[in-house]
């Protein structure tokens, strides 16, 4: 058995969560066109007969003015401890800028690192990709791969390349285990994902989700779980937006979240949502560490 621990790192919205989901062939991490969808380190476990590859998806590193943003960045830096391979992502349709260079400086001393040019379905010009690869080489990467989330073959090839960095070791997790995260965490993230999908650009970043209860009393008999959850917003004015006219918005969020949870957990779900205000939680570390980790 060969094993490997790796971290997927980069700016917000470069395809980190999409990559993890494609490797696992399971929708574990939130994927959104809106930045900062990932708030936690999320471990994904790829297993086959001969290999176990452990990947950590991380929040996008960005310049921030809030304590919450600082916490997200700190989680990404924390993920670099005691790992075997750094996987840095940069999209084909965006130039490498100061944000990328800042991250590359953070990982410059890692011997084992690869760069992935993502989203080549959006920009596949040979000239553009060649220039980007040259820039990445100048930033210290010896191995650079171009991938598209829409091309399953390129993901398979990438997995084989990553396997080259693995080493002999004992299996770390059961072979049928995809993540160390609990079903409560997956439910929480599914509710937050529904909010991201259905709310305007800024509001999803002002939301915290807490699972108040996760009852499995009827799971064995009816394959049913009952979930009660609270969605917290940053200020009073956001509460009305989240509820919507006549409760229309929160109803849509509830329906979407329930379907996501059912699909991911393979159970029937009764979902109950309520909304509360926690003023300026983004700058109160005790609050966001309690409710969003």
Curated annotation (Swiss-Prot):
Binding site for GTP: 10-17, 57-61, 118-121
Family named by the database record: Belongs to the TRAFAC class TrmE-Era-EngA-EngB-Septin-like GTPase superfamily. Era GTPase family.
GO cellular component: cytosol; plasma membrane
A GO BP annotation: ribosomal small subunit assembly
Disulfide bonds: none
Residues covered by region (G3): 57-60
Localization in the cell: Cytoplasm; Cell membrane
PANTHER family named among the record's database cross-references: GTPASE ERA, GTPASE ERA, MITOCHONDRIAL
Protein name: GTPase Era
Subunit structure, interactors included: Monomer.
Gene3D superfamilies per record: 3.30.300.20, P-loop containing nucleotide triphosphate hydrolases
Positions of the UniProt region annotated as G2: 36-40
The keyword rRNA-binding is annotated on this UniProt entry: yes
Molecular function, one GO term: GTP binding
Its job: An essential GTPase that binds both GDP and GTP, with rapid nucleotide exchange. Plays a role in 16S rRNA processing and 30S ribosomal subunit biogenesis and possibly also in cell cycle regulation and energy metabolism.
One Pfam family cited in the UniProt record for this chain: MMR_HSR1
Keyword field contains rRNA-binding: yes
Segments forming domain Era-type G: 2-168
Region span, G1: 10-17
Domain KH type-2: 199-279
UniProt keyword annotations, A-Z: Cell membrane, Cytoplasm, GTP-binding, Membrane, Nucleotide-binding, Ribosome biogenesis, RNA-binding, rRNA-binding
Membrane topology: Peripheral membrane protein
């Amino acid at each position: 058995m060969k094993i490997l621990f790796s971290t997927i790192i980069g700016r917000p919205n470069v395809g980190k969560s999409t990559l993890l989901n494609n490797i696992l062939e399971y929708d574990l991490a939130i994927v959104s066109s809106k930045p900062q969808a990932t708030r936690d380190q999320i471990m994904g476990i790829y297993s086959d007969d001969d290999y176990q590859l452990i990947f950590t998806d991380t929040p996008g590193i960005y310049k921030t003015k809030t304590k919450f943003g600082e916490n997200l960045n700190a989680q990404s830096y924390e993920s670099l401890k005691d790992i075997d391979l750094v996987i840095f992502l940069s999209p084909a349709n965006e130039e490498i800028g100061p944000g990328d260079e800042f991250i590359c400086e953070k990982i410059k001393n890692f011997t084992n690192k690869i760069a992935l040019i993502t989203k080549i379905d959006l920009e596949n010009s040979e000239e553009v990709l060649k220039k980007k690869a040259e820039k990445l080489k100048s930033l210290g990467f010896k191995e650079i791969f171009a991938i598209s989330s829409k091309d399953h073959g390129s993901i398979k090839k990438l997995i084989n390349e990553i396997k080259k960095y693995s080493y002999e070791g004992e299996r770390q997790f059961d072979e049928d285990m995809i993540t160390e995260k609990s079903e409560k965490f997956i439910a929480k993230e599914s509710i937050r994902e529904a909010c991201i999908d259905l709310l305007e650009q800024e509001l999803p970043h002002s939301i915290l989700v807490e699972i108040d209860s996760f009852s499995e009393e009827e799971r064995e008999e009816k394959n049913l779980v009952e979930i009660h959850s609270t969605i917290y917003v940053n200020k009073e004015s956001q509460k009305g937006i989240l509820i919507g006219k006549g409760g229309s918005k929160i109803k849509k969020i509830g329906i979407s979240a329930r379907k996501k949870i059912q699909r991911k957990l393979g159970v029937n779900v009764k979902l109950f949502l309520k909304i509360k205000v926690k003023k300026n939680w983004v700058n109160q570390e005790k609050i966001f560490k309690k409710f969003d980790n």
